Amino acid sequence: MEQAPNMAEPRGPVDHGVQIRFITEPVSGAEMGTLRRGGRRPAKDARASTYGVAVRVQGIAGQPFVVLNSGEKGGDSFGVQIKGANDQEASGALGSDFELPENPYSQVKGFPAPSQSSTSDEEPGAYWNGKLLRSQSQASLAGPGPMDPSNRSTSMLELAPKVASPGSTIDTAPLSSVDSLINKFDSQLGGQSRGRTGRRTRMLPPEQRKRSKSLDSRLPRDTLEERERQSTNHWTPSTKYDNHVGSSKQPSQSQSPSPPSGFSRSRQTQDWVLQSFEEPRGRAQDPTMLQFKSTPDLLRDQQEAAPPGSVDHMKATIYGILREGSSESETSVRRKVSLVLEKMQPLVMISSGSTKAVAGQGELTRKVEELQRKLDEEVKRRQKLEPSRVGLERQLEEKTEECSRLQELLERRKGEAQQSNKELQNMKRLLDQGEGLRHGLEAQVMELQNKLKQVQGPEPAKEVLLKDLLETRELLEEVLEGKQRVEEQLRLRERELTALKGALKEEVASRDQEVEHVRQQYQRDTEQLRRSMQDATQDHAVLEAERQKMSALVRGLQRELEETSEETGHWQSMFQKNKEDLRATKQELLQLRMEKEEMEEELGEKIEVLQRELEQARASAGDTRQVEVLKKELLQTQEELKELQAERQSQEVAGRHRDRELEKQLAVLRVEADRGRELEEQNLQLQKTLQQLRQDCEEASKAKMVAEAEAAVLGQRRAAVETTLRETQEENDEFRRRILGLEQQLKETRGLVDGGEAVEARLRDKLQRLEAEKQQLEEALNASQEEEGSLAAAKRALEARLEEAQRGLARLGQEQQTLNRALEEEGKQREVLRRGKAELEEQKHLLDRTVDRLNKELEKIGEDSKQALQQLQAQLDDYKEKARREVADAQRQAKDWASEAEKTSGGLSRLQDEIQRLRQALQASQAERDTARLDKELLAQRLQGLEQEAENKKRSQDDRARQLKGLEEKVSRLEAELDEEKNTVELLTDRVNRGRDQVDQLRTELLQERSARQDLECDKISLERQNKDLKTRLASSEGFQKPSASLSQLESQNQLLQERLQAEEREKTVLQSTNRKLERKVKELSIQIEDERQHVNDQKDQLSLRVKALKRQVDEAEEEIERLDGLRKKAQRELEEQHEVNEQLQARIKSLEKDSWRKASRSAAESALKHEGLSSDEEFDSVYDPSSIASLLTESNLQTSSC
């Protein structure tokens, strides 16, 4: 807000709250735009025609609000203005995180309350006829362009005409002013005089003290920049109705491109308030225009309206329902609302929780049904594939047996061929030996012949030679004969071998073809089986994985439901507590505001009294003393006012602090409510983090290798440090030797002291030099000591880190021990699993035996039932043949009787009786045959039922066998998983061993570091001692000469020492960095080991669950076997009962045959006896003619044929 140029008195430092000032002169044209904060107009005319009180009240977020004193245009206007800071301060206030506490009298969106009061004092029967707008002195928002200065109003707020919309008229009626309010209340109170005192002292009764619902459903406040960007909202004429008041929003006009610098916030506040009230109601209500009232004194208490479904929303709805058409007071209605809410709250909580649980349970049941359906389909498919698989397995076994038989034949033939080859080789060897002998003998013969030719000696020698020749010839002939025999044998063997080879080749070719054919068939069958088994196993594995996932999801959802229920209960309790705290703070704030308003009223009264007294004193009294006294009193009152304002500001700051704390608590509640959503995201992130952890494990292994390399580098560096330390020790020894030399030189100089005064002068000069050098040495020593101190500190830090590393290693050792224990427990569990597997195998063998026994018994039962059926069929055939014979006999007898009846004419009555008896007997026999036939059908039906039961039992046994095979596959799978677990455990042990090796390496490095540190400390102590000795010697050698060569050597040595110390510091920094890296790697390894341990525990849990499932399946198999035993026993009992029934039927049939035979014999005897008593032929012809006899015979034939 801009300040007026004709400001006379200084303005007070008022930024917030209420400010009251007197106005005793009309507002000039230059002052029509704004009212200054805390400023007063100069008191030129004390007795002006108009006066008033401008009350400035802090609004929401620093927004102003003004009520006119007079509604006439062009006249003077004074009134209440909600005053904020200047433009910059207001923007800052708007941008701050300031939330107001909940208004207990607020109306919720969508439920408008009746108009109880307004900021403007309207005439009776007038509702919202216009809207409060800014004064045209700053920027007129009533029209599209600025107004003339002559047309401007002197009031702060002016009732501007509404923007013309299609089909609407312009209403320029102003709001009624504060004077009209005073008149109205004066008239209501009856007789109270109009004036300022009446306004101050008049108190409304409780029934008329009504708060406005202007901003009860305000939205979260916007920033000043956003409000300045928005266009000014214009309102269409509102409709008046009985109970509810609202407003509807029309399209806004564009804002002027260059607003004036003194832009007032009262219009912004008004537009924003109306817009925030309009937005939620425009969605829920009809297009009918609802009225809206806003009051300036209660805008601070407004807060965001509760969303639909909340407690406040329910409270507002119940309040609106109870308030309609009721004449009760507001407190009684609110008490009823609170009672209804207390009774409804547990029902709402139960309904919300039950709906969520029912929805989750429905989803779970649907998923379980889908999984069960998939499992049933898989079982059916596997049952269909099972018979083909059994046949293929049988073919496979036959083919394998044939292959093994052929392989045995091949091996046998190969052995025979090898033996024949060996014999051939032996024969060839013998032939070669014979050939060699023949060649040798021929050579000998040739030699002898040569000797004979050469030696023509005496005859005895010739005879000897001839004898030798003969013997050799005989030997040669024998050898040739043996050779021929051997060759013949060889030829025979070769022929046999060629024949055998040809036969073998043919057999091998045929066998190879058969084997190839069988192998191809076997491969095809095995491929088909493999594919089917792989598909079945994959589907089964997928189903099991889905089932496990669903079970895990169900458990997780149950846990989450329990956790969410607990969390909701906790948060509800917290929310209730926070609500109570908010209400308490709200009540405190309301009390503080009431006290502040009372104090402001008292201050206003005091200030008015003081001003009146001051004016009276100025007008009447001329005494300066009284003026000074009044001035002092004014100053005191001003000081008191400032103190009160400071107290008020401190109270406001405390209220703001409380509001901020409440906002923080609300934010914490919202954050805690959002945690439930974040849990699902965290579950997804956990899977990603697991993959990242695996990648990190691989990277950790790589980093481990790098760490080992770095450890090797560290060892080399430590060796270098140790060498440098040894060199420093050697240099220190040299330094000691030089010091000893210096001491000797000093002794020599002491001997030369007696030489003379000239020598003393030279020695003094040298002593000065020595002192300077001594100072330099001391400085160098101090520097070296400081460097040693820094080295010691670095060593301490390294030791501390190494100790931490040792602790981490100790922790790793403990974790390794726990892992070893876990591994031992897993080994025990595996042993238990193996035992369980052995037991399952034993149970499987027992089940196989029982199934085989049951199959054999069922086969026996089937054979017995077939035999019984065959016997019954044979008996029935016999019965049929007997019946046919009896019918033929009866027909023959009937024919005989007919011929005899033709011959005889007597005994018709007897014959008719006999015929009737025969008919009855035939009917009885037919009835008995029918019963026998029915019994036979019943027996056939029972046999069919038994056969069906036997087939069902076979099927169930096949299903049981399939289940057993599935159990075997599961056991094999579990064994494979156990092997995998063993491999993982071995890998874990390898990693643990590597960790141990790393720990040992780190321990050795720590020991080396400690030894190096001890050496350095010893060197440091020795150096300190040497320094002390040097100091003492230098102090004693003052005044004696010292050679300069030794000083230069000492300086060079000091420089070398400094360089070495710097190098050591660098190496120490490098060592520190490597130690840090090692510590990080150790931490990563520990994390990796923990993850692996958790993974092992998870796998252990999975194995335990699978073992339980297998045990459950075994129990189910045992129950099924017991059920099959019961069915077998039941079938045996039924078969025994059937045998008994068959025996009974056979006995009955025999008795029937005996009865029929007896009846037939009796009837034949009676007919023979009664044949003589027949009547004449006419009588026979008349009573029993041939046509009747033929009909009887045909009836009997038909009856027999039907039987």
Curated annotation (Swiss-Prot):
Region spans: Interaction with TJP1/ZO1: 54-67
Domain of life where this protein originates: Eukaryota
Any one GO biological process: microtubule cytoskeleton organization
Biased composition range(s): Basic and acidic residues: 207-231, 883-903
Motif (ZIM): 48-62
GO cellular component, one term: bicellular tight junction
GO function terms (MF aspect): microtubule binding
Entry keyword Acetylation: yes
Assigned keywords, A-Z: Acetylation, Cell junction, Coiled coil, Phosphoprotein, Tight junction
Record remark on domains: Deletion of the TJP1/ZO1 interaction motif (ZIM) decreases but does not abolish colocalization with TJP1/ZO1.
Record note on quaternary structure: Homodimer. Interacts with TJP1/ZO1 and SPEF1.
Family label: Belongs to the cingulin family.
Name of the protein: Cingulin
Organism: Papio anubis
